[in-house]
Amino acid sequence: MKIYYEKDADISLIQKLKVAVVGYGSQGHAHALNLKDSGVKQIKVALQEGSASRKKAEAAGLEVVSVADAAKWADVLMILVPDEKQAVLYANEIEPHLRAGQHLMFGHGFNIHYNLIRPRADVDVSLSAPKGPGHTLRNQYQMGFGLPGLIAIHQDATGSAQAVALSYSKAIGNTRAGVIETSFREETETDLFGEQAVLCGGIVELIKAGYETLVEAGYAPEMAYFECLHETKLIVDLIYEGGIANMNYSISNTAEYGEYVTGPRLVNAETKKEMKKVLEDIQNGTFARNWVLENQAGAPGFHAMRQRMSSHPIEEVGEKLRGMMHWAQNDRLVDKSRN
């Protein structure tokens, strides 16, 4: 596995080019601001008409243009609008204005891997994917650090696709931590699996089930919140810092023993069998097709599930308890008024 660091990338390449960041959400705001702070002078944010993000981007000192105008102007287009919106936006606002030698970049391989976007052969197509949310990418950059990232080349029409992609990755801070060379397929499938089975789907359902079990047994919701949600960060921080063994070194023997005897009762062979089915749905395109169809119908199921989750009792309890933790409100990663 090839890993690139600061010395492997020439930041002057991206500094000489005209760069448009399409979208200004979690990833878009971090990419645009990190590029700007890294000396990329010719940078614009491309947004659709009426976008609520326009004021945020302009307040940050960034020039905002239409997506079509960005496609005509830029040498490098980083497409960071939500996955479900990219294909239509590309077909209507980007593809008609492309010229030979331009460089299309993506922060996630979803649309390329599942052939929802099929770029013409005379443009470069690459991936520069930070391994973390945009708010964390920006925070780490400002602290002088960086997030690990991934790089992949789908098309190299000019012969310089990799050099430019590495230069871009350096400008957003990824080479400070290391950039791993991969493929669009590998990035897409592992990313989706990690999100669904572990990081978002798995953890959230485990937290909810634990909380509900304690509350239904008569324990105070506040105690259930602390034990099943709040302390998750404390444990994950230890794992993040030095692995599972590092976490086990820090916790009590009682907690460690409980990990060994109880963990396998909850996550067992049946769980792993279901995980393999989840991976198969990702690999064969079932998940992608379902997500595309959901959005073509206006995403009614998605919005209903989002509403149910935001209305879960753990959210109300958490909001009340977090209001008591003033120290936890300092240096917030997410400030919805700015990013």
UniProtKB/Swiss-Prot annotation:
Signal peptide feature range: none
Gene Ontology BP, a term: isoleucine biosynthetic process
InterPro entries: 6-PGluconate_DH-like_C_sf, KARI, KARI_C, KARI_N, KARI_prok, NAD(P)-bd_dom_sf
Residue span, KARI C-terminal knotted domain: 183-328
Active site: H108
Pathway listed: Amino-acid biosynthesis; L-isoleucine biosynthesis; L-isoleucine from 2-oxobutanoate: step 2/4; Amino-acid biosynthesis; L-valine biosynthesis; L-valine from pyruvate: step 2/4
EC number, UniProt record: 1.1.1.86
Binding-site residues, Mg(2+) 2: D191, E227, E231
Cofactor: Mg(2+)
Binding site for Mg(2+) 1: D191, E195
Keyword 4Fe-4S (UniProt): no
Keywords in alphabetical order: Amino-acid biosynthesis, Branched-chain amino acid biosynthesis, Magnesium, Metal-binding, NADP, Oxidoreductase
Gene3D superfamilies documented for this protein: 6.10.240.10, NAD(P)-binding Rossmann-like Domain (3.40.50.720)
Residues that coordinate or bind substrate: S252
Protein name: Ketol-acid reductoisomerase (NADP(+))
Source organism of this protein record: Hyphomonas neptunium (strain ATCC 15444)
Lineage of source species: Bacteria, Pseudomonadati, Pseudomonadota, Alphaproteobacteria, Hyphomonadales
